[in-house]
């Protein structure tokens, strides 16, 4: 009898342990797969591609790669003497046409005062037409002067905002063309996180919800707030042929990969460039409020930690 009870007890304990283990594994799996989190997140920032508006030789480079610069600080300078001469030439043209316009204005005024009693109507009209032509030439010369002045000002390339110079690839003596990107500027205090959430987890993601961001390779947890969720992503399963007909890719009905949707998260505190734009992180959306770690069970703490490793 005792042997039977002992065997029954062992069997019952084993069954209970198996059931508990199954429940724990099931809960862990649900928590792992359905809670709003992702390891596919990246730090991002506002980046300005700086390109000159004029062409010419670079005469001076005032910054070095990865330098923190202030708004308005000179980055590099392009061939100012050439554009200074162009401005002087345009100013000389303006001065010439101003004198010529004054002369033609006086001539036309004199003929208009004398009238047809002293000369023919054709001569009066001709003087007025010449005056109008000179005035148009003067306006054109003034526009050319203003453009030359603008070009001269734009030979000095300045930082459009506070930030870090990155990927600087210009050097003194190098010829640069108008519109070619010379350097990128990562704006200071513009960092945010783009978390690519699976569509199955978007139920728990709403603007205003709190989020935890853990940079890859770091134990530091940053706080943030969900700013927005992308309104759409590219449909990779459907394209159009050259006749405009829809082309649908074949797929396996029992294998469906969840689409990833970008979620923008604003950081509570800017971290400067400790984690540069493009580096990866793990993001957990905790809901309307921050997670209270003191209330977490051992299981939840382990689950949060395991998510760092995928």
UniProtKB/Swiss-Prot annotation:
Cellular localization per UniProt: Cell inner membrane
Keyword line: Cell inner membrane, Cell membrane, Membrane, Transmembrane, Transmembrane helix, Transport
Keyword check for Transport: yes
Signal peptide annotation: none
Domain of life: Bacteria
Keyword Cell membrane (UniProt): yes
Pfam families: CusB_dom_1, HlyD_D23
Transmembrane segments: 12-32
Cystine bridges: none
Induction of synthesis: Positively coregulated with aaeB and aaeX by AaeR.
One GO term describing the cellular component: plasma membrane
Bilayer topology annotation: Single-pass membrane protein
Chief site of localization: membrane
InterPro entries linked: CusB-like_dom_1, CusB_D23, MFP_Efflux_Pump, PHBA_efflux_pump_AaeA, RND_pump_MFP
One GO MF term: transmembrane transporter activity
Stretches of the chain forming a coiled coil according to its record: none
Family per similarity comment: Belongs to the membrane fusion protein (MFP) (TC 8.A.1) family.
Protein function: Forms an efflux pump with AaeB.
Protein name per UniProt: p-hydroxybenzoic acid efflux pump subunit AaeA
Organism: Escherichia coli O8 (strain IAI1)
